Amino acid sequence: MQEVAANKPREKAGAHTMARYGFQVHASILKILEVHRTGADYRAVFDHFDDLMMLDRSEQPEKVGFFQIKSQDKGEWTLAALTAKKGKSKPATFLGRLYHHMDAFGVMVSCLGFVSNLGFKLKLIDGTETTADNLVIPSSQLHPDVMAVLRGAVAKDGVGNTAVDGSQLFVFERIGLGLIEQDKFVKGALVEFIHEREDAHYIPVISLYETLRGSVFTKSGVTEEFTTEAEFYDRKTLSRADVETMFLRATSGRRFLDNWGTIAGDLTANGMRSRRMIVLKNSCILYIKARSVGEPGATAFNAAARDIIIAHQTEIDSYETLPEIVAQLEKWLPSDYEHREGALYVESFEAIG
């Protein structure tokens, strides 16, 4: 992974348009959800070497899939369109750019995926042509004549002479994501995904969508080269654990607000008046939102609070009310974080149980 982080990426995100980003970001989220629901470990890498890389492990990966994510207003992807030259730089074709990764990654490559909102018009091994029902078309289903054209195209593109033949790794995929109302489509996919989880009741879909979209969008836009693996992971990737953390943060924030009535009862018994309570609740909400989107101050406070809570869990478990826990956490955790008071209450609430 150190070589991947330090290597100069082929894709440079700053040169691409916002319109392209919209489809690419949303398609990347859908691919993340697809892999995440299998239970497998992974690390997604955005706009580094290609539109999307999917590593089979978050640490020390053995396999990597590459994806070109392309959107069009109308039509379908024919063999001629897939092998047509785009621009003057080499490799000049979509498939050549995908196959180019065989040079650098060889046997590590598990998939060379071409993902689009449009369908494909390709000849299948039985002599028939693909239809709208063919959503995922691996190379193994394509006619030998088509495979010969694909191999010839990447050879002309100057990337066909690799030590490992990657032509059988091509996969052509049509996804349901369109060019309009992409946010609604992905939110719908999130709803389906969340319903499969035990904590579904507590996860706010819109908040989770905004967090995922914002994270993928930001990481796609980073164009620098990296000197450390840790920096690369932080700025350009999302792992399974990272996405789970997003779910947990969204869940815990919802649970805190759902239990505000109980919390308010403790605060009232402790002598807090309504005006003061409203200010506190707003501070809690601001902290929950800041933490859910990965705001540095909020994540730093969260990390520090987690360490202290783990170190003092036995003592924390001995307290009967939330204000008692807050009072102790305030002593243990000196900080000038702007939403400190709300953060103390949220972290203290999550420390219970």
Please report, for each region that a protein language model flagged, where it lies by residue.
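Acidic metal-coordinating catalytic centers involved in nucleic-acid phosphodiester chemistry
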Residues: 1-17, 70-347
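Catalytic centers of nucleases
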Residues: 14-18, 24-85
